[in-house]
């Protein structure tokens, strides 16, 4: 999905944003769009918005509801995903195991093979927010060796960390494009006719 520019980098990309309920996904979506804080209700289904990222990349960002009954449908949004953004509430240590399990399930889906992901530890402005190193360890992010990934702290409330999150999306998208081009080149060397 998406188009590639002359440098081999995607000019358009599909970004799926997932995470448990109350992580702040919808608030982040609209803050990334440059809006003031908006009052949100729990997302039933999805929200979709276009977004510009560094490098003149047009993103289509899908914000998928995170309540437990809706998670069974998450797999329906994964086909054609270029980048996954996984949002968690960094003040809710009790739900980190549940969040880790859901992230693992998403990344184990066949549609997610090699798809890079960005974990956004939201609500970092709160005094009880967990440090990123603790979140990284609790999610065991190092085990996802078949994916490029980044972990960023942010605040949908203050906007802190969101410019860096957009830069991370661009970096991960470039890594995905490079991996696809390398796979094609490697396939051509072997005489493989498959296309990535």
Swiss-Prot record:
Keywords: GTP-binding, Lipoprotein, Myristate, Nucleotide-binding. GTP binds at residues 19-26, 63-67, 122-125. InterPro entries: P-loop_NTPase, Small_GTP-bd, Small_GTPase_ARF, Small_GTPase_ARF/SAR. It holds the Pfam family Arf. The keyword GTP-binding applies. GO terms for biological process: hematopoietic progenitor cell differentiation; intracellular protein transport; vesicle-mediated transport. GO terms for molecular function: GTP binding; GTPase activity. GO terms for cellular component: cytoplasm; plasma membrane. The keyword Nucleus does not apply. A lipid is attached at residue 2 (N-myristoyl glycine). Expressed in lung and leukocytes. It comes from the Eukaryota. May play a role in apoptosis. May act as a tumor suppressor. It is linked to Leukemia, chronic lymphocytic: A chronic leukemia in which functionally incompetent B-lymphocytes progressively accumulate in the bone marrow, blood, and lymphoid tissues. The clinical evolution of the disorder is heterogeneous, with some patients having indolent disease and others having aggressive disease and short survival. Belongs to the small GTPase superfamily. Arf family. This is ADP-ribosylation factor-like protein 11. It comes from Homo sapiens (Human).
């Amino acid at each position: 999905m998406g188009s590639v520019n002359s440098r081999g980098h995607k000019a358009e990309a599909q970004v799926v944003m997932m995470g448990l309920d109350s992580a702040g996904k919808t608030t982040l979506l609209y803050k990334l769009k440059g809006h003031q804080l908006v009052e949100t209700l729990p997302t039933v289904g999805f929200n979709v918005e276009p977004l510009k990222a560094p490098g003149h990349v047009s993103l289509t960002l899908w914000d998928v509801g995170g309540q437990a009954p809706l998670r069974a449908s998450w797999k329906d949004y994964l086909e054609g995903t270029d980048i996954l953004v996984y949002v968690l509430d960094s003040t809710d240590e009790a739900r980190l195991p549940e969040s880790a399990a859901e992230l693992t399930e998403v990344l184990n889906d066949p549609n997610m093979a090699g798809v890079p992901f960005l974990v956004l530890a939201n609500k970092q402005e709160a005094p009880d927010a967990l440090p990123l190193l603790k979140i990284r360890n609790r999610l065991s992010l190092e085990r996802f060796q078949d994916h490029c990934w980044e972990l960023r702290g942010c605040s949908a409330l203050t906007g802190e960390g969101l410019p860096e999150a957009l830069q991370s999306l661009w970096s991960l998208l470039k890594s995905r494009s490079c991996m696809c081009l390398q796979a094609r080149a490697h396939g051509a060397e072997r005489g493989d006719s498959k296309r990535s």
